[in-house]
Curated annotation (Swiss-Prot):
Pfam families membership: HTH_1, TOBE
GO MF: DNA-binding transcription factor activity; identical protein binding; molybdenum ion binding
GO BP terms in the entry: molybdate ion transport
PANTHER family associated with the record: DNA-BINDING TRANSCRIPTIONAL DUAL REGULATOR MODE, TRANSCRIPTIONAL REGULATOR MODE
Domain of life: Bacteria
Start and end residues of each Mop domain: 126-192, 198-264
Protein name from the UniProt record: Molybdenum-pterin-binding protein MopA
Stretches assigned to coiled coil: none
Family: Belongs to the ModE family.
InterPro entries attached to this UniProt entry: Mo/tungstate-bd_C_term_dom (IPR008995), ModE (IPR016462), ModE-bd_N (IPR003725), Molybdate_resp_trans_reg (IPR051815), Mop_domain (IPR004606), Transp-assoc_OB_typ1 (IPR005116), Tscrpt_reg_HTH_LysR (IPR000847), WH-like_DNA-bd_sf (IPR036388)
Keywords: Molybdenum, Repeat, Transport
Length: 265
């Protein structure tokens, strides 16, 4: 008989979106204590960049921002956990307590088959997609094969996705329905400033460069869209230099409607 106790590992996830687990809740709690992402990152054992990226993912995942922060490098930049973030921390704690009680009952005499447990753990599966944006459908135009779906992201920002007509029908897409828009960072093109001129990509999100991370070949750019929303692009290092992209510089993210994948909660 296995004497090792069951350990609860609570994870919350909407379909197609990154999970929110105890590690992210601990990060939120640390931000609330320290008032900076850098201090919180040190406490929970993350790099500053990983913690900053996690905050961006959380803010994109929820309707209201969980953290309001200003980039300030590894030693600066204030951060504040919002009321929505505090509510998530409290709610997650209640769920963890309930799960612990349920596990106590499970250990009392019920032995779940290994395959059943594996099925449960699969619910916490992560996605490699870099950009997951919570949106609201504003219009659906159905065609014979494809459907054009218009989405509201934030005040002043909207997206368009082109998916199959069958997918739009099966998902029940209609104005007011909440969805998640998934866009690979490598699909996002960047233009300096707010007017990219004539281009066929119908999705144009203008913001301010919040962070730049250079690699030997590629550069990751995080664009602040306002209202604590952001989008990430991976472009060549040469292109980033040619465009003069640096924190504080305005830029526009461009991507095709066909590169937007939609997922529902």
């Amino acid at each position: 008989m296995n004497e090792q106790p069951l350990i609860a590992a609570l994870s919350l996830q909407r379909a197609g979106a990154p999970r929110v687990g105890g590690d992210r809740i601990r990060l939120l709690e640390a931000i609330a204590r320290h008032g900076t992402i850098a201090g919180a990152a040190r406490e929970v054992g993350l790099s500053y960049k990983t913690a900053w990226d996690a905050v961006g993912t959380l803010n994109n995942l929820f309707e209201q921002p969980l953290v309001e922060a200003a980039p300030g490098g590894r030693t600066g930049g204030n951060a504040r956990v919002t009321e929505a973030g505090q509510a998530l921390i409290a709610g997650f704690g209640l769920l963890e307590g309930a799960l612990t009680k349920a596990l106590g009952v499970l250990e009392g005499g019920v032995s779940a088959p290994e395959k059943a447990l594996n099925t449960l753990w699969s619910l916490t599966m992560r996605t490699s997609n870099r950009n997951t944006l919570r949106c609201t459908v504003t219009r659906v135009t159905l065609g014979a094969v494809n459907a054009e779906v218009e989405l509201a992201l934030t005040d002043g920002h909207s997206l368009t996705a082109v998916i199959t007509e069958r997918s739009a029908t099966e998902m029940g897409l209609a104005p007011g329905v909440e969805v998640f828009a998934l866009i690979k960072a490598s699909f996002v093109m960047l233009a300096a400033g707010g007017d990219p001129g004539r281009i066929s990509a119908c999705n144009r999100l203008t913001g301010i460069v919040a962070a730049r991370t250079d690699g030997p070949v590629n550069t990751e750019i995080i664009l602040d869209l306002g209202n604590c929303k952001s989008i990430t692009a991976v472009i060549t290092h040469t292109s980033a230099d040619a465009l003069g992209l640096a924190p504080g510089v305005p830029a526009t993210a461009l991507f095709k409607a066909s590169h937007v994948i939609l997922a529902m909660p």
